[in-house]
Amino acid sequence: MIDKNVVTRIVDEWLEGKDYFLVDVTVSPDDKIVVEIDHAEGVWIDDCVELSRYIESKLDREEEDYELEVGSAGIGQPFKVLQQYLIHIGKEVEILTKEGKKLEGVLKDANEENFTVTIEKKVKPEGAKRPKLVEEDITFAYDEIKYTKYLISFK
């Protein structure tokens, strides 16, 4: 079986000096290798082809046959690494907490320990007839959530 760490090192070599970042590498028991990369401005097919060829040049099919798939992390897919949070700051995201609560808001900040989302909620001021929309910042530790993903809007 092909070692995931070997593939990760090869991808890291290719990424040096580029604005792309590695999201995930998986290697199945039947040697299907899946590499996911991302970029602040999107992933171009030409770069996926270039990375695929680079990986193929470093692995020996004669020694061990494999299937290789290189692509983008995919819009609307849950974030897997901090860089994905960072490139989506200022954009709408959907969060599902481990308690099963789903929230939508604007990603405000992210760091190694947690991230902050600004949500809008209705609050009825005392004596008012109608509730008003107010913004609230909520900070989550990564282990408090099941997923965070970019919210695709067709407005």
Curated annotation (Swiss-Prot):
Q: What is its main location?
A: cytoplasm
One biological process term from GO is: translation
Q: Which UniProt keywords apply?
A: Cytoplasm, Ribosome biogenesis
Subcellular locations according to the entry = Cytoplasm
Q: Which GO terms describe its cellular component?
A: cytosol
Q: What does this protein do?
A: Required for maturation of 30S ribosomal subunits.
The text of the family note is: Belongs to the RimP family.
What is the protein name given in its UniProt record?
Ribosome maturation factor RimP
Q: Which organism is it from?
A: Phocaeicola vulgatus (strain ATCC 8482 / DSM 1447 / JCM 5826 / CCUG 4940 / NBRC 14291 / NCTC 11154) (Bacteroides vulgatus)
